[in-house]
Amino acid sequence: AACTLNLYEEPVSIKTIECAIIDRGFEEGWIQPQKIDKKTGKKVAVIGAGPAGLACSQQLIRAGHNVTVFEKNNKAGGLLRYGIPDFKMEKTVIDRRIEQIGAEGVIFSYNTTIGKDISMDELKNQFDAVVLTGGSEYPRDLPVEGRDLDGIHFAMDFLPQQNRRVSYEKISSDTQEILASDKDVIVIGGGDTGSDCIGTSIRQGARSVTQLEIMPIPPEQEDKSLTWPNWPLKLRTSSSQSEGALRDFSVMTQSVSGE
């Protein structure tokens, strides 16, 4: 919407250009760990190794502080690693950045839950400052009749479990296994997360996948006179949707029936 070429022809995709530049930078070795010449002697604890924690820790280490990142999971990345499927974003993109951050001096403490493995009082005693960079992992619920029936799951439970499965991470024995194999799947929500659930369900061998979208079907062509910061409405089909999902528009879920 921000590219003026869109008024007359195909616009230039800024995201694609930026991604190509970054990939080339890593391939050619142009992106290297920065050498920190001056240290402050200050120690900072960063809680959470998601996008915010990674960005924060790199800025702090470059400012000369000693930084330790505490992460409850086995690996860093947050929802980039555990929420976005591998078929949509390869995790090497995260790994190469974490390698750079670690080479600059950031220490990562994995499988560490604050309040369980280490207390806030201990952190306050050991560090000069503590930064909270935890992400939001609480999904938005659907308060309708039948919501508590078996077989209804949050994307926040479904997607991270599959990501751990494909990366050969151990899934907790206390966690209910969620698989779409040989099932007729309904995905409520027409956004990116819904598309991720579609692609994951298809790869798990679902019999069918239907996506319900509360909004009406948008036009196939956008209003080219509408420019940034407005978002032009246009029918978009993700790669996951094109793999075989049925899409139903203008549908509001009012209840769920079954056993």
Task: Locate the predicted segments by residue.
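Residues forming the flavin
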Residues: 18-259
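Iron-sulfur (Fe-S) cluster-binding segments and ferredoxin-like electron-carrier domains
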Residues: 1-24
